[in-house]
Amino acid sequence: MAVVATHQFAQCITCHVWSPDQTMVAFCPNNNEVHIYKLIQDKWERAHVLQKHDQLISAIDWSSRTNKIVTASHDRNSYVWNQEGAEWLPTLVILRLNRAALCVKWSSAENKFAVGSGAKTVCVCYYEKDNDWWVSKLIRKKHSSSVTSVAWHPDNILLATTSTDGKCRIFSTFIKGVDTRDSGTSIPDSKFGEQIVQLDLSSTWAFGVKWSPSGNTLAYTGQSSMVYFVDDIGPSPVAQSVAFRDLPLRDVLFISERMVVAVGYDCNPMVFTADERGIWSFVRFLDERKLAPSGSKYGSQFTEAFGKFYGQSKQMGSDTVDPTRARGGAHENCITCILPLRSEGVTVVKRFSTSGLDGRIVVWELDSD
């Protein structure tokens, strides 16, 4: 059974992210601002509004170690926000883009971040202490269309990208003076911007790339209602394509090495798992309106703490797909973002959040059995 709780923060949410202690959530309400809400006595109250961009903010990320927020916008700019006292102060990042910035992610070590753009370019940004500013090195002439998503490998060197040219690519982002060769990367002698592999699995736009916790598996989605899983990244990767008959997906999240939750235009998170042979398949929707068969392994429930400040609406679950079922439930419009909510010292994701074009943020918790 799936129990879902939601909060209506805005009419539409472009993207969202959590503070390191998960007591604050930042999101873009489909404009040029970032709204930060803080949990105070079981109620969400708006604490800050970040105003610096001139156009729509397309992506945001909040570093867990350094407590810095990075934003990317259609105005072709990116800012790093530092909290000083009660204020968040922006620092402009020199991106050198002539098209919109579409996605942004901090690296695993949080000493770099990557910005994908409509200029067919990826900007890998790092801080120059001597000059007290953020600069970028550009990966050019590799993508033939807009870069829709970026994902950092746990080694802090490899970067995966997806593009509207239908391809997923993996690059080295080694920067001398910022990275070290003993980072544990499987490509120890790679240079900045070197393309490690290009995956041509999708014939349509590609979105939502993510690495598994170990970095051994990569997953991304295609506009043709397909999910792609890739193992053994290198000259001879092992790839699988999983087709489904529902609407396309926009983002994916590894719950564990063998479980993925994906979200998109169907307004309902979808669970994919791998069997003992490593074969991936669709399992179920998380927010179904039908009773799940007895013995269903995966379910969803909302924690009591979050339930106090989110309005709860219970929905039933099912492991079978009914083409006549009502779509949605917790979400009523496209889900564009899914993020993990990790507990300290726990590698397997038990809780995660989703946000969408309906202006809602939903927090889910998977059953432990």
Map each language-model feature to its residues.
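Blade-loop segments of beta-propeller domains
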Residues: 45-62, 66
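Canonical WD40 repeat/beta-propeller blade segments in eukaryotic WD-repeat proteins
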Residues: 10-18, 55-62, 98-106, 144-152, ...
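Structural hallmark of WD40 beta-propellers
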Residues: 22-26, 66-70, 79-80, 90, ...
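Per-blade loop-tip surfaces of WD-repeat and WD-like beta-propellers in eukaryotic adaptors/scaffolds
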Residues: 1-4, 31-48, 77-101, 109-112, ...
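N-terminal alpha-helical scaffolding segments that mark the starts
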Residues: 1-20, 24-28
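Conserved strand-to-loop turn within each blade of WD40 beta-propeller repeats
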Residues: 28-31, 72-75, 115-119, 162-165, ...
